[in-house]
Every structure is written in C-alpha cells, then in structure tokens.
C-alpha cells in the first residue's frame, strides 16, 4: 500500500520523466545553490538583458517577431526552439564548473538523470557530484527487484511514449549493458519496433471474461464538453477542486473513464488540476487509450533496464554514491526575494550529520513521491494500515523545507488523508505453471515467449 497518492489540490508537473508526481508544487525539485542562484529573478528580461549582448542592444521593439528575438530567454531563464538544429549540438563547458559541486537527494530516475546531465552536458567532474540515498540500493520507485523472502516486488513503473524528449535525449548517451556499441535508447527502440506494445484484452468482467469495450469511448456530448471545459480552465481556478467537482456521471460512467483511470491510476476524488495536466500532457495519445498502443516498455523491469545502466555510467564517471544517508532538511537563507540553500541536515546510518554549503554548491531535491512510505504485505499478512507514514522520508523532508517559506508548497495536501491518497499494487511470483493457462486465456498470449503479454 502506498500512502503518497494524489488527493493534492495544488501542483504542477515539471518533468516528462515522472508526471506521476502531481504532488510537485512550484517548489518541486527544490533546486538550491549555496549562495548561487536558486530562483530566477522576476522581470529580469527587459532593458538590462538587452544591454548584455551586441545585436539585442539595438534591436527594434518588435524584434520578438523576428528570428533575432526568438532566442531571448524568458523569466525562467529558458527559451523555446524548434527543429533539431540544437538537439544534437554539445554545450560549451560552463565557466568555473570544475569549482562547483552538486548534492542530489535521492537516487530515483529524476535524481540519476540530474547527475547524468551534470556529467554529460554540465561537464562537472564526477567526483564533485554526491548522491545522497537513504536506502542501500539506487532506483527509487523503479525498484523491480527479486527479494528472496517476498519474490519480485515492484511498486511502480514508468509508462513511456514517443514524446519523452528528455528521457530519450538522456538514454542515447547511456551505454547498453548487453549490446556492445549500442545505447540504452538503441536497444529500447529496436525492442519496441520488433515487439510493439498493445493489448488484446483491455478490460475484464466476471473474473476474467473480456469486457469487449471494442475501442469505444462511449462519451456523450455533455461528457465531451465537461472534458473540454476542464482542459481550458486556468490552473488557479482548479486549486482545491477534485475531479468530482468538474465531472459527473456523463464522464464517470463512460468507457473513456475506464480507460483513463486504469492507465493513469486516477480516482474520482483526486486533483482536478492534475487531471487537467495529464490531459495536456497525453492528449496526443488519445487514440492509444483503448489498447495501450501509445505505450512503450523496456525488455526487463525498469530497475535493470534503466537504473542499472545509469548507475554504471555515473560510477564510471566517478560520481559519489552515499547509501544509508537520509536527508532530513535543507536549510535556506531567505532574503531580498532569494532563497539560498546553506546547509543539508542528514542521518547517516543513524548518526546525525550536516553538510555546510558554499556559493559553489548546487542542491537538487525531488519533493513528494508516489511510493514514499510504502507498507509491505505478503502471502500471509496484509499491509499494516495503521502505520504512520506521513512523517517518512521525503514527506518529512518536504515539511521541514516548507516550514521555512510558504513558497515551498503545502505537503499536507498530499499526505494528510491517507485513506484518499494511498494506492495499492501487487506483484505475483509464480512457483509453477498452474496460473499460466489463466493468463493466456485472458491476454490471448503465451507469457513464456519473452514478448508483450498483457500490453
């Protein structure tokens, strides 16, 4: 049972790699930096920025509509481009990067990706990058590992698709562990070309009988309008609203809702804002909802296919992995509209320790997690529903950070009512062939082929 599900009323998803974290607020991935920059200055564009480089100094007021103006950075310090002209160019080495260090809290997919980009694009020396992980193994929620006492345990997995631009950009640079000379992206691409994902039985009724949804959405005109209205509603108008506040039975009784909630694990009482963000993120794959054909998967579980190659890449670059290190707080100096991380408080194998930060230190934190505070059950024991999980791991860390400034979000929105935020998953390790005919009968595929089974 996982207590970190989304009843949250506020939030913005910020990464194509883990959109499941609707719990990420504007403070998500709290990126601190010693006395360096943490938050972008507002209104930093304008006249001052125009004085910095030659061509922009004398540009006309309307230059934003020309090729000259399209690369001006916005207030977040980024600009948007198109085509692949910039996609494959290697960045210049940042000035002074050899004098900087990075502290990354956790070792899940987002944390390891941050470290990989620091090595590849940031060209930071590997031994200047420190990954602080409370557990004794990397991977975070990508933890499909065989446990001799429980069998295979896998709390979650990423549902990947064509437009995971950051993920694919990263894994084109991570060497495959099995195919010499190939990248993880190469082997992933070849696999999904030869064995594309789709389901032959999207839903069942009566203990395994095909529900025969026939790919239809069964949405009324009113239901379609409710979805369109949500899609167009400003984010701020959806704070503190649930999906039940914006949809009625016209949507909830449709096959579309069956497809949607089973693909993305939504409940009726979850955040309306997160629902909207998912619509915006995956609207281009609406045709793949009825049979999962929009999705792509790795050959093995994602710990072995994604995490281990990243970990080896980082270890070979000299990155410092510190297991058994639980970060409990990041201390900020808040003044003049800036938030600067000055220290990290952590518990190393049970002993309290601290890390003092300088202006050359960067800190990366992912706050909130769908799998934090996991309570395990087994063949003979149900998960202990009375266990206190709201103070575990990253929830406690986020609360300690949030106490320092309201801008860091409201974690209690996502972990205060466990009955509405928990979610359950189950993995079954078979000991013989007795169950296989039942799987074959439902999925219309032999699970022993090594190819797609359920879709």
Residue ranges and their predicted role:
Residues 119-146:
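Glycine-rich FAD pyrophosphate-binding loop
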Residues 106-108:
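Glycine-rich Rossmann-fold phosphate-binding loop(s) that bind the pyrophosphate
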Residues 176-281, 296:
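Rossmann-like flavin
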Residues 3-14, 21-102, 120-126:
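Extreme N-terminal leader/targeting segments of oxidoreductases
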Residues 111:
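N-terminal Rossmann-fold NAD(P) dinucleotide-binding loop
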């Amino acid at each position: 049972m996982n207590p970190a599900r989304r009843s949250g009323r506020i939030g913005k998803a910020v990464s194509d790699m883990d959109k499941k974290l609707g719990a990420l607020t504007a403070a998500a991935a709290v990126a601190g930096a010693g006395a360096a920059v943490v938050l972008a200055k507002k209104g930093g564009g304008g006249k001052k920025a125009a004085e910095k480089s030659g061509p922009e100094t004398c540009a006309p007021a309307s230059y934003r509509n020309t090729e000259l103006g399209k690369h001006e950075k916005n207030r977040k310090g980024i600009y948007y481009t198109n085509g692949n002209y910039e996609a494959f160019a290697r960045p210049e080495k940042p000035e002074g990067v050899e004098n900087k260090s990075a502290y990354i809290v956790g070792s899940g997919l987002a944390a390891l990706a941050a470290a990989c980009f620091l090595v590849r694009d940031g060209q930071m020396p590997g031994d200047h990058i420190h990954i602080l992980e409370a557990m004794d193994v990397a991977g975070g929620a990508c933890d499909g590992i065989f446990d001799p006492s429980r069998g295979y345990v896998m709390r979650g997995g990423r549902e990947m698709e064509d437009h995971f631009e950051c993920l694919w950009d990263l894994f084109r640079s991570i060497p495959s562990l099995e195919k010499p000379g190939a990248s993880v992206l190469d082997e992933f691409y070849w696999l999904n070309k030869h064995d594309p994902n789709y389901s032959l039985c999207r839903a069942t009724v009566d203990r395994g009988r095909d529900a025969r949804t026939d790919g239809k959405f069964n949405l009324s005109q009113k239901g379609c309008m409710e979805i369109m209205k949500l899609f167009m509603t400003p984010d701020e108008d959806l704070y503190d609203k649930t999906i039940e506040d914006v949809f009625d039975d016209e949507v909830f009784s449709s096959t579309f809702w069956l497809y949607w909630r089973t693909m993305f694990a939504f409940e009726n009482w979850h955040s309306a804002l997160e629902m909207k963000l998912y619509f915006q993120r995956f609207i281009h794959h609406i045709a793949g909802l009825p049979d999962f054909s929009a999705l792509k998967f790795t050959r093995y579980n994602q710990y072995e296919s994604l995490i281990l190659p990243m970990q080896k890449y980082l270890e070979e670059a000299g990155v410092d992995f510190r297991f058994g290190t639980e970060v409990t707080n990041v201390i900020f100096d808040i003044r003049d509209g800036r938030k600067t991380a000055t220290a990290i408080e952590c518990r190393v194998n049970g002993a309290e320790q601290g890390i003092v930060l300088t202006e050359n230190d960067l800190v990366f934190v992912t706050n909130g997690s769908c799998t934090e505070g996991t309570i395990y059950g087994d063949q003979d024991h149900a998960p202990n529903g009375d266990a206190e999980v709201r103070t575990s791991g990253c929830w406690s860390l986020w609360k300690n950070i949030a106490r320092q400034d309201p801008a860091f979000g409201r974690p209690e929105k996502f972990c205060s009512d466990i009955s509405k935020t928990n979610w359950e998953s189950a993995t079954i390790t078979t000991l013989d062939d007795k169950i296989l005919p039942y799987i074959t009968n439902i999925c219309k595929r032999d699970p022993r082929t090594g190819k797609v089974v359920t879709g």
